[in-house]
Amino acid sequence: MNGVINIYKNTGMTSFDVVAMVRRVAKMKKVGHTGTLDPAASGVLPVCLGKATKIIDYIMENKKVYRVNLKLGMVTDTYDLEGEVLREEDASHITKDEILNCINSFVGTIDQVPPMYSALKQNGVRLYELARQGIEVHREARKITIYSIENIKIESNDNIQMDVCCSKGTYIRSLCYDIGEKLNVGATMTALERIQNGTFTKEEAINIEDLTEELLEKHIISIEKALDSFEKITVNEKFGKLLRNGVKVFDNRMYSEEVEFNKLYRVYEDNGVFLGLGKRDEKGFKLEKLLIEE
């Protein structure tokens, strides 16, 4: 069985728990998820089976949409409710307009410092392992992109909800923390749900608790379909043969569409055969991942 199943992970489970359950149902070992969701978070977790494990890294590049709840006036060491409260502030004076203006100021490409409680490594040691020892180290800010923040609901300063569309590598806990710091009262993430990963949506996801062999076979998505978030280009069979053989082709006649530099595309021959994912640079166009079904 080769393909991707759109799974909904419940709170309290690790992402590896989901993989283990899919392995049991599918009766196969070659299974992997496409981006960790913390146990306290829920939501969309595409799981790749068989040859589809080759495209895990590409699905992880997708834009993600998270539904997040945060509380103003409280800061924890983990930036969420799992951690120890470090400080509390009175946030009752913060107005809705101030909150909205602050939240919207984070839209765009920004520098974000990852939290200490994260799986990133420093000198070979995971940051959360250092944090558990009470050690805090300097973390370099990383460029991330917040594409949009929509559906902002301010029920009270204790409960603000918003939908955040962001790039790979974004820490929503850090976003909440940074919003709180900018408002000078602190903030903590209180709930997190991933509602979309590229073309994989919450509405179409299968709850991991409901997964059966029959549901898996019915809803598994082909490798080709799972890459729908990448734009499509078509080449003729002559150039297709060169690409299949790993040749980098420098010839603008090979594609009819406008092809940007350093951008991944789904590549098809003009007879409809899906070849894989390719990228153009100054020296030509080459398949980065050959995915043709033999």
From Swiss-Prot:
SUPFAM superfamilies: Pseudouridine synthase. Keywords: Isomerase, tRNA processing. It catalyses: uridine(55) in tRNA = pseudouridine(55) in tRNA. The lineage of its organism: Bacteria, Bacillati, Bacillota, Clostridia, Eubacteriales. One of its GO terms (biological process) is mRNA pseudouridine synthesis. InterPro entries: PsdUridine_synth_cat_dom_sf, PsdUridine_synth_N, tRNA_psdUridine_synth_TruB, TruB_C. This is tRNA pseudouridine synthase B. Belongs to the pseudouridine synthase TruB family. Type 1 subfamily. Responsible for synthesis of pseudouridine from uracil-55 in the psi GC loop of transfer RNAs. It comes from Clostridium perfringens (strain 13 / Type A). It is an enzyme of class 5 (isomerase). Disulfide bonds: none annotated. The gene is truB.
